Amino acid sequence: MESDIEILSEADASMRKLRIFGIDDREDENGRRRIKDVEVYVPIVCGSIAFYLGKKATEYRTHKWTVYVRGATNEDLGVVIKRVIFHLHPSFNNPTRVVDAPPFALSECGWGEFKIDITVFFHTDVCEKKLELSHVLKLNPENAYGPIPKSIKIPVVAESYNEVVFPDPFESFVARVHNHPAIQISNIPDGLNLPPPGVADTYYLMEKGDTKEHPLSPWFLKFSEVEELFKLTAARQKVQADIAKLKRQLIMVDGQPEGLESSSGYEC
């Protein structure tokens, strides 16, 4: 298995499902073992919230904004994510900002919209590969008909949903997150004896990392419907795969089914 990232599905630019492949070793140098055919699903959101400063605005400070990476249901992502680096516009002092603990967020003031590149690092027993995301900071409100008046009370919210899938995870990672309310695990073998929950790198030093009581949480978008859409899509794909597998088995047992043409269109 190559170290790579695969886009499994993409409803639009703001909704993606990604599979991150790790190094194909069932056991690493630390003795950690992978669980074959198991997948861990972690829904994350990257976004920004910007408030217009109104009368307090100056030429180069018109908005106060916060950019962040959070759990889709505001649960703690510190069990999965170790560090997030936000790459701001080069006009900012120290444009490369490192956040080493949840909540993974930073706030600034400015006047212009720009693309923020985001690098997500996972704990060593989660994945060896970093995840590169990008987010366009939005300051000016608009709707389907175009720009609308600015308000100091209602912020501009821009968020995107990413469901990250980790195949063949380490046992220690699964043990740490198998009771996590926002993380799903598929195909856990019956009778699997998990080791004690792994202490992920510096996770034990981190403070409470959920964003349920974050000051900006009232403005966070809800993604429960998106999660259901991905679940339905995954279920449909599994059914289709099972049907295709059954058809192949029938062909092997009984030969080509009557009325079914060969895929090439030619007689064999």
Curated annotation (Swiss-Prot):
Residues covered by the YEATS domain: 34-180
InterPro entries hit by this protein: YEAST_sf (IPR038704), YEATS (IPR005033), YEATS_dom (IPR055129)
Residue ranges that the Swiss-Prot or TrEMBL entry lists as coiled coil: 227-252
Disulfide bonds: none
Signal peptide positions on this chain: none
Ribonucleoprotein as UniProt keyword: no
Reported consequences of knocking out the gene: No visible phenotype, due to the redundancy with TAF14B. Decreased FLC expression leading to earlier transition from vegetative to reproductive phase. Taf14 and taf14b double mutants show a pleiotropic phenotype that includes small size and abnormal leaf morphology. Taf14 and taf14b double mutants flower significantly earlier than single mutants under both long days and short days conditions.
Protein's UniProt keywords contain Ribosomal protein: no
Expression sites by tissue: Expressed in roots, leaves, inflorescence and flowering tissues.
Any one of the GO BP annotations: flower development
Location relative to the cell: Cytoplasm; Nucleus
GO CC annotation: cytoplasm; NuA4 histone acetyltransferase complex; nucleus
Sorted UniProt keywords: Activator, Coiled coil, Cytoplasm, Developmental protein, Differentiation, Flowering, Nucleus, Transcription, Transcription regulation
Family affiliation: Belongs to the YAF9 family.
Function: Negative regulator of flowering controlling the H4K5 acetylation levels in the FLC and FT chromatin. Positively regulates FLC expression. Component of the transcription factor IID (TFIID) complex that is essential for mediating regulation of RNA polymerase transcription. Component of the SWR1 complex which mediates the ATP-dependent exchange of histone H2A for the H2A variant HZT1 leading to transcriptional regulation of selected genes by chromatin remodeling.
Quaternary structure note: Component of the TFIID complex. TFIID is composed of TATA binding protein (TBP) and a number of TBP-associated factors (TAFs) whose MWs range from 14-217 kDa. Component of the SWR1 chromatin-remodeling complex. Interacts with TAF4B, TAF5, TAF8, TAF12, TAF12B, TAF13 and TAF15B. Interacts with the transcription activator complex FRI-C. Interacts with SWC6, FRI and (via C-terminus) with FLX, SUF4, FRIL1 and FES1. Interacts with EAF1A and EAF1B (via HSA domain).
Protein name, UniProt field: Transcription initiation factor TFIID subunit 14
Organism listed in the record: Arabidopsis thaliana (Mouse-ear cress)
Lineage, broadest ranks: Eukaryota, Viridiplantae, Streptophyta, Embryophyta, Tracheophyta
